[in-house]
Amino acid sequence: MEERYGKLAIANLLTSIWFGDWKRYEEIMEDVPEPLQQELSFHSFYKRDEVQLWHDNHFFIPGDHFVSPYFSSYPTNSGDEEDRRKDLLCLIGLYEKTGFYYPLEQDRFPDHFGSLTAFLSSVMKEEIEAEQEGDSQYLEQLEELEADVLHQYIQPVIRPLLQQAEMKVKHPFFKEFLRFYADMMENGWVEAAE
């Protein structure tokens, strides 16, 4: 149960960064004990005004420093543009099927990395409830859903995202954040689930 709460906190933190919700980021970090804050390498570079400006430059305003925050912008091993379009439609269907309307409420596209991590947060909340209620069958379904989202939508585009960011991301907060995000989604998330 403790791991689920930890993953939920991390997913909420990642979501706040992807969406540039600095008020929420600061609220979350206030609750993080100092020793754990030091493990979040990006946090030592946090200066709200700078980070807010560079967030817009990196993830919102197209230009020299722009890095797309949308999974459908990146090629995957298997795919052409048609495959990415199908993946996007499947993701939208998944959101509708589970009643996840956060991207619409936030006026964001469903394939935004912030939307994906917000969805993982939503799944984590459901997992916590299922575990508390002793509903092992529902918990297993949720764990499979969580793994599917990671394997189908996030992990295949981590390397292309980092390659694009390598030359464009200048601010150390975001350099460290992207490294942390990649490591968490490729390794840490899975380890925390086990």
Named regions from a protein language model:
Residues 1-194:
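Surface/interface-facing alpha-helical segments and adjacent flexible terminal/loop regions used
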